[in-house]
Amino acid sequence: AHSFYPGKNLGALGDAGAITTDDASLADLCRALGNYGSSRKYVFPYKGRNSRMDEIQAAVLSVKLRYLDADNRRRRQIATYYAQHISNPKVMFPGAEAWLRGDVDHVFHIFPVLCACRNELQEYLKQKGIGTMIHYPIPPHQQDCYPEWHTLSLPITERIHREELSIPCNQTMTDEEVRYVVEAINFFLMTA
């Protein structure tokens, strides 16, 4: 399954997505479920929903697809610059060593960092005009849909949840904006 949520690297104007499979039966089932549960007009063997992508979303995506490789390259450039120039020891980059060595590939839909004083860093960056987000504000095992997991002790998940902060990383950023983010994060060392 592929999400084309507007904030993604290949994002539509509204919600959109796609499913790819080499299984014809699964493809038929997915088509039916995304068409109100109908595999042919007025016949509904399944409970489904309207999940069809409209033509406008498809047209936007077909144009944006041409730029995806270049956009992802730019995101990688920004991420590399962050990893090489953010020197604040309070800010960590999970998995950075692997992608800097080229062991793994990454397209940086978001650029998450970990910081034990995450809330203070977020407020500081906000004061500097730098937008950030927490991905995601509620850890999966604490979601209402999983009440049976609420009592689980998941110390690593909970620590990451307390420390994760996503900093700006998108292809429209200028080099000057990227440097500004780095300088602000590095200066946070002296103020926190």
Language model region names:
Residues 22-192:
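PLP-dependent aminotransferase class I/II
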Residues 12-16, 61:
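Adenylate-forming
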Residues 1-12, 40-45:
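Conserved active-site segment immediately N-terminal to the catalytic lysine
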